[in-house]
Amino acid sequence: MANPLRGPCVRATRPHARRAEQGLPMKTLAKLPVTIVTGFLGAGKTTLLRHMLDNAEGRRIAVIVNEFGELGIDGEILKQCSIGCSEEEAQGRVFELANGCLCCTVQEEFFPVMRELVARRGDLDQILIETSGLALPKPLVQAFQWPEIRNACTVDAVITVVDSPAVAAGTFAAHPEQVDQQRRQDPNLDHESPLHELFEDQLASADLVILNKADQLDAEALARVRAEIAGELPAAVKIVEASRGELPLPVLLGLNAEAELHIDGRPTHHDHEGHEDHDHDEFDSFHVDLPEVEEAALLEALGELVERHDILRIKGFAAIPGKPMRLLVQGVGKRFDRHFDRKWLADEARSTRLVVIGQELDQAAIANQLRTALA
């Protein structure tokens, strides 16, 4: 299997000259703070990280992205800072760990990256880690107890991003209709759902919970979501509301939680499993390449697609005729968000590429349906 690491990469905001270059004595290096961002598929983790990078204010940040799927869409998004960023700066800031789950590949994938970043910690102020929406955060936090990491890094906080409208509708799971049917038949079955357990485990590991997409709910619905989430959390865990992950960096960084010291005392559903036997739901992922497409036609075609197939997540980029900017498309279930994220580069082919994630997918049928609808 080819090594999925694409590095070495560090965010290229470096306004502070190195002390050695100034002829100043070297200070003893403090522990490097690490923020772990977790949350279910489509909650808005990548959007949050992009907001943090765009507002870094000189902080030298390295990013590790753990994606599910063969196409590094999240890594590509994070390599683009605010519109107008130079192409040179846009490269070399992100490590991508693809086709895996950090909770299962800590030693073979995550550890080599951390070893490299530890060696370079004098050039860094912060590490951000975005986990896959299918990952368990607790084993990742526990990895920071290892001697080679714990002496150099500390987990400043685990931030869990929650899709507020999905929770309000009871549709954070991949198959809301099935969940509702199970809930009607036996309320206890929902709590034994692997997806529900994953959601609860992500909350159990949190030092800060973000109720994202809060602008899409009225005050009453948002209050219900807050109460539901608060019922899953220790009283000390703070809950904040956000729209598109837009929060001041002092809210997100500098929490000093030292989560690696306390994570063992946070019970989760998977504590008594041998992690080598940890079983994820079987998900398929593949990408579909298309030419330029009309925005309205694309959204209609994607809506029809999720009606006919067991699709959990669609994410990618689209080229819209006559538009100089690339359209970022992200969908969970029947809900699709889109916005223009940056201009097409001069040497970049204007094309559409979508990643589809789901269960028992007929890849040929899905690709043919899309191409026929958009022909």
Curated annotation (Swiss-Prot):
<feature type="short sequence motif" description="CXCC motif">
    <location>
        <begin position="101"/>
        <end position="104"/>
    </location>
</feature>
<protein>
    <recommendedName>
        <fullName>Zinc chaperone CobW</fullName>
        <ecNumber>3.6.5.-</ecNumber>
    </recommendedName>
</protein>
<dbReference type="GO" id="GO:0005737">
    <property type="term" value="C:cytoplasm"/>
</dbReference>
<dbReference type="InterPro" id="IPR036627">
    <property type="entry name" value="CobW-likC_sf"/>
</dbReference>
<feature type="domain" description="CobW C-terminal">
    <location>
        <begin position="283"/>
        <end position="374"/>
    </location>
</feature>
<feature type="region of interest" description="Disordered">
    <location>
        <begin position="173"/>
        <end position="192"/>
    </location>
</feature>
<dbReference type="InterPro" id="IPR027417">
    <property type="entry name" value="P-loop_NTPase"/>
</dbReference>
<keyword id="KW-0378">Hydrolase</keyword>
<keyword id="KW-0067">ATP-binding</keyword>
<dbReference type="GO" id="GO:0009236">
    <property type="term" value="P:cobalamin biosynthetic process"/>
</dbReference>
<dbReference type="Pfam" id="PF02492">
    <property type="entry name" value="cobW"/>
</dbReference>
<dbReference type="InterPro" id="IPR051316">
    <property type="entry name" value="Zinc-reg_GTPase_activator"/>
</dbReference>
<dbReference type="GO" id="GO:0005524">
    <property type="term" value="F:ATP binding"/>
</dbReference>
<dbReference type="GO" id="GO:0016787">
    <property type="term" value="F:hydrolase activity"/>
</dbReference>
<comment type="pathway">
    <text>Cofactor biosynthesis; adenosylcobalamin biosynthesis.</text>
</comment>
<keyword id="KW-0143">Chaperone</keyword>
<feature type="binding site">
    <location>
        <begin position="212"/>
        <end position="215"/>
    </location>
    <ligand>
        <name>GTP</name>
    </ligand>
</feature>
<keyword id="KW-0547">Nucleotide-binding</keyword>
<dbReference type="Pfam" id="PF07683">
    <property type="entry name" value="CobW_C"/>
</dbReference>
<keyword id="KW-0169">Cobalamin biosynthesis</keyword>
<feature type="binding site">
    <location>
        <begin position="104"/>
        <end position="108"/>
    </location>
    <ligand>
        <name>GTP</name>
    </ligand>
</feature>
<comment type="function">
    <text>Zinc chaperone that directly transfers zinc cofactor to target proteins, thereby activating them. Zinc is transferred from the CXCC motif in the GTPase domain to the zinc binding site in target proteins in a process requiring GTP hydrolysis.</text>
</comment>
<dbReference type="InterPro" id="IPR003495">
    <property type="entry name" value="CobW/HypB/UreG_nucleotide-bd"/>
</dbReference>
<dbReference type="InterPro" id="IPR011629">
    <property type="entry name" value="CobW-like_C"/>
</dbReference>
<feature type="binding site">
    <location>
        <begin position="39"/>
        <end position="46"/>
    </location>
    <ligand>
        <name>GTP</name>
    </ligand>
</feature>
<comment type="similarity">
    <text>Belongs to the SIMIBI class G3E GTPase family. ZNG1 subfamily.</text>
</comment>
<dbReference type="GO" id="GO:0006779">
    <property type="term" value="P:porphyrin-containing compound biosynthetic process"/>
</dbReference>
<keyword id="KW-0627">Porphyrin biosynthesis</keyword>
<feature type="compositionally biased region" description="Basic and acidic residues">
    <location>
        <begin position="177"/>
        <end position="192"/>
    </location>
</feature>
<dbReference type="InterPro" id="IPR012824">
    <property type="entry name" value="CobW"/>
</dbReference>
